[in-house]
Amino acid sequence: VYVPQGSDWSVTADTDLELAVCSAPGLGGGVPVRVIAPKDLGQEVRGKGTNTRYVTNILPEGKPADSLLVVEVITPGGHTSSYPPHKHDQDNLPAESYLEETYYHRLNPPQGFAFQRVYTDADRTGARSLDETMAIEDGDVVLVPKGYHPCAACHGYDLYYLNVMA
């Protein structure tokens, strides 16, 4: 369900559920409330070889969402995603757009782990303003304020992430 800024809403569940509330400051674009049905979700395969991953576009670029982009990605064990590395920290369309990004990670089986590196380009001295490599466990959230952000799923552990950008 897409709910624009300033709207009142609530959720009532009859069974246990895992609910993701993805939000960002809106631009006041007047986008109406709407149900995003499974038939409306675009699915695609990105990458080749060990860079193959499976993407479900929930709120993709080009669909009205008042500055919010949401995708789900499944990266099979032994594969990488958000790779080759790319970034969203400059307003330089069409090559790059300025976006902050979060990753909500799940693993199957859940006792597994993956890796994610968030880093910037090196300056003339070789220093980076951001360079963090994290062991990701089931349920972890990673904030990407700037820089590149590739993920690697270890063999035997499929990596799912909900990717939210604004």
Question: Which residues fall in each region the model found?
Answer:
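Active-site environment of non-heme Fe oxygenases that use a 2-His-1-carboxylate facial triad
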Residues: I58-D66, S81-P85, N92-Y98, Y104-P110
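Short, conserved beta-strand element in jelly-roll/cupin
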Residues: V1, E72-P76, A95-S129, A135, ...
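Surface-exposed beta-loop interaction hotspot
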Residues: D16-G77
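Short, compositionally biased
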Residues: S23, G156-A166
